[in-house]
Amino acid sequence: LQIHRAVSAAQSVVLAHSVGHDVQQQVADVLFARASADGRLSASLGGLFPTGAGVTITPHTPTHFNPEEYGMSSVALRRIDSIAKRGIQEGAYPGCQIVILKDGKTMYDHAFGTHAGKGSALVRPTDLYDLASLSKTTGTLLALMKLYDRGRFNLSDKLSDYLPWLQRTNKKDMTIRELLLHQSGLPAGIVLYPEAIDKESYKGRLFSARKDALHPLRLGVTTWANPNFHFKPETLSRTRNANYTLQICDSLWLNKSFIKVIQEKIIEAPLGTKQYRYSDVGFILLRFLAEQLAGMPMDEYLAREFYEPMGLERTLYLPLQRIPKAQIVPSANDKFLRKCVLQGFVHDESAAFQGGVSGNAGLFS
């Protein structure tokens, strides 16, 4: 009777058919999701659990812990709720998810608000987000570390030894180490969209310092834009076909030959001194390097070597190929260039114009 009451009141129960030390250790590991358990009851247990009852636990199953056991305060963590809700009320963001880990243990994991304001989907703990520049360290850098460990390159190697299109340029002597340290002299970024816009399709200038009839769209404090332009038909298409294969939003496909335009823009980019300057361009080049060394697209290499073996099924590039759009939080409402809400498509322009996989951005999780 006492056991019946105890089991009825328990939040979870692990059934083990032995009191041996090894079994006790296995049960402890299951409780902390350090070991797997996938058994099912072969017979009912006194009205408590029916035949076939059971859940599957794997080392990837999320678990929660008492913050006080790790030197943290539950009271202090609960204050985060009010801060997150105030941000939503003041319009700073429509929703968010906040996760706090300590020593690999989940101390706090809560979702707030909606994807895009009133009437849109609620934020869920399993939703995906555009990781933006975190793609550099959680994507590109991982690929290069693996390739380095396999002896495929040295940090002192010149990038042009692997990317021949750089050999007759002022970038021919840049080393891989310089790119990783953001000390190559490359600029912070390159602007690609002017190469896709038909300059004959709009009147006047594309941007203005003040709002007027031609520039109704505000992009910044002193920047107003003319959104009434068309793309070059040889660059972008409203339908997919054999040449237009790189999707950059719901209804725009980029010509796969645009990669040559990107290479030209990198070649033309001015070089500064070898001092620290954070550069997306350097990591765009490192993606080209990773693919050259791996012999396959970087997103496929990362999935094979890291994400799939680690059970990170919801960490990936090009998420719409595997994840329903409703499970991806919108990144932005692009009223100027792509003229749509970006949901499942990378926000970063440089990554978008590479089809969604880039060394500087593109990863979702």
Model-derived regions: residue spans:
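Short, surface-exposed loop or secondary-structure junction motifs
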Residues: 171-365
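Active-site-proximal beta-strand/loop segments in catalytic clefts of secreted hydrolases
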Residues: 1, 16-19, 101-103, 112, ...
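Short, conserved catalytic-motif segment at the N-terminal edge
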Residues: 69-131, 152-154, 260-268, 341
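Sec-exported extracytoplasmic/periplasmic mature domains
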Residues: 32-36, 85, 89-90, 145-152, ...
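Short active-site loop at a secondary-structure junction
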Residues: 90-99, 119-181, 269-282, 358-361
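Short, charged, surface-exposed loops that flank catalytic or proteolytic processing sites
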Residues: 41, 154-156, 294-300
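Extracytoplasmic/secreted envelope proteins and their assembly/folding machinery
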Residues: 24, 28, 77, 81, ...
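C-terminal non-catalytic regions of proteins with extracellular/luminal or membrane-system context
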Residues: 1-66, 70
